[in-house]
Amino acid sequence: MRRIDSCFAELRANGRKALIPFITAGDPSLEATVPVMHALVRAGADVIELGVPFSDPMADGPTIQRSSERALARGAGLAYVLEAVHEFRREDATTPVVLMGYLNPIEIHGTRRFAEAAVAAGVDGVLLVDLPPEEAGETRTIFTEVGLALIALASPTTSEQRLDMLCSTAQGYLYYVSFAGVTGASNLLDTHAASDRLRQLRRRAGAPVVAGFGIKDAASAAAMAVDADGVVVGSALVAALAEVNDVRSARERAEAFLAPLRQALDQG
């Protein structure tokens, strides 16, 4: 959790926006995950969101669903994900890593056992798509005790009552879903409507607010970052990585994809 807080504090002090790429652990291959993570950092990533493959990713569109299926077929379970983070930490002790996934694998593992193992591996935060904030108290308590941030999601359809809860309990950063739907589903991103909501959230939240869903390239990243503390890019990056087979190509594709987004954010 401290790495996330330090990262955003440094970005704020330098007037910069966070660039947060999402990749699925184990895709395009088990061997490529850690090299791609390092490549993303070289290209300007501030935080890395690492997707935990799950058999029923209900909030994800076809691109990430297929990515998750491929990773699971290769054996990329929770143990693999934690080992990948541990390996990443051998060379990178500063870049925050956030796991993004679903509640079921963690409940099977045991919440406290998972939290302790995640921190030991070098994980800084966890975003659980299907954990309602009203039911997150016990999980948040366990995570806080071990130093793990429970990242919350807000969307255009989130009620005011729930927003109050999310803003008051936000840890690490608050992830604002810029439109209602599944990941990668929209070709049209309404930046004006999202910007209004982002400004409201930043006034209310006790943590940085980042925007995701629908960000596909440098232009959409720069537009969304104007009123956010950072942006998340997922499906477009996952789709780009799905086109390559070997580790070297995956590294090169990751850097080539992310570098223009970093440049756009820094120039904006």
UniProtKB/Swiss-Prot annotation:
| EC top class, as a word | lyase
Protein EC: 4.2.1.20
Q: Does the keyword Lyase apply?
A: yes
Name the GO cellular-component terms: cytosol
SUPFAM superfamilies of this UniProt entry? Ribulose-phoshate binding barrel
**A Gene Ontology molecular function term of the record:** tryptophan synthase activity
Supply the alphabetized keyword list.
Answer: Amino-acid biosynthesis, Aromatic amino acid biosynthesis, Lyase, Tryptophan biosynthesis
Catalytic activity reads: (1S,2R)-1-C-(indol-3-yl)glycerol 3-phosphate + L-serine = D-glyceraldehyde 3-phosphate + L-tryptophan + H2O
Please indicate which superkingdom the organism of origin belongs to. Bacteria
| Protein function | The alpha subunit is responsible for the aldol cleavage of indoleglycerol phosphate to indole and glyceraldehyde 3-phosphate.
Mind telling me which PANTHER family this protein's record contains? TRYPTOPHAN SYNTHASE ALPHA CHAIN, CHLOROPLASTIC (PTHR43406:SF1), TRYPTOPHAN SYNTHASE, ALPHA CHAIN (PTHR43406)
What is known about its subunit structure? Tetramer of two alpha and two beta chains.
Q: What is this protein called?
A: Tryptophan synthase alpha chain
